[in-house]
Amino acid sequence: MNLNLLPDLALFVQIVDQGSFSAVARQNGITPSAVSRSVSRLEREMGCKLLQRTTRKLRLSDAGETIYQHAQQMLEAARQAMDSAGSRQTVAQGKLTLSVPKAVGRFVIHPLMMAFFHRYPQVDVCLRLEDRPLDFIDDGIDLALRITDTPSPGLHGKPLMPIRHVICATEAYLQQHGTPYTPQDLRAHSCISLGETPADARWKFRREGKTETVQTYGRYAANHTAVRLDAVRQHLGIGSLPLFTAREALANGDIVQVLPEWEFISSYSGDLWLLWAGDKHMPARMRAMIDYLSETVPALNAGSTEPAK
């Protein structure tokens, strides 16, 4: 085997996964023609066509499918070898990629990173803020945080803290428009919801075993918690917010919780889980981040006012 083709095989796997020469070129900082030449070298060496290209998509030949599967196994073996070497290190060092939901990354994880860097000066972190399913191997993820009650089978992990939601407004808004005392009172208010589906405007509450649902209305909706928080601060209405987003503004008195005696039930609630793909040969940097987040994230809930249960 020509070992000089190993980089081409790695690039070939990326091409198949991405389905685009140009996407792979951008990802690797090379030109599409360089990607095309890489495939041509492989096809010359293998003596067969690996990819069928059309104007819209790439299709693997039978030989290409076989090569792709073996190349994937080769890359996974290489990753395991590197992780195995890293697990023998006693000092946490190297680059770690951490994938987190956008709002959690902005309000929970990013504020903790400066202290992490101080504690572990030889660890570099790539914090990826993304709200999508992921594949630890294909996406190059070391650790991930996800809000779920049922982590995917095959993953290892631990819950760090519950994610609860509250509804909030400013004192100025409530003085002008009145304070709601029951969920049904919200019908007379401008409510700021997530806005991704019609169900996001149907707010559900629970108190002493009783559940109430109210159809809310408002001139503004936004699918990012920071935007909804800012809208609430600007007196635009009563907004639904994760408690981790609202906590600082509540503590400062910038906003107040509305209907605090009712539990606001959100379909986006659950536990914040720290997840990883395997326990074998774990690099010291991964263990350091797991230990650090296990220590610091649960502490964020200490002393905070949770919604009524």
Curated annotation (Swiss-Prot):
Record's keyword annotation contains Transferase: no
Keyword terms: DNA-binding, Transcription, Transcription regulation
Top-rank taxon: Bacteria
Domain HTH lysR-type: 1-61
SUPFAM superfamilies: Periplasmic binding protein-like II (SSF53850), Winged helix' DNA-binding domain (SSF46785)
Biological process terms in GO annotation: DNA-templated transcription
DNA-binding region as annotated in the record: 21-40
Listed GO MF terms: DNA-binding transcription factor activity; sequence-specific DNA binding
Keyword Plastid appears in the UniProt entry: no
Family, as annotated: Belongs to the LysR transcriptional regulatory family.
PANTHER family, per the entry: HTH-TYPE TRANSCRIPTIONAL ACTIVATOR TTDR-RELATED (PTHR30537:SF5), HTH-TYPE TRANSCRIPTIONAL REGULATOR (PTHR30537)
Protein name: Probable HTH-type transcriptional regulator LtrA
Originating organism: Klebsiella pneumoniae
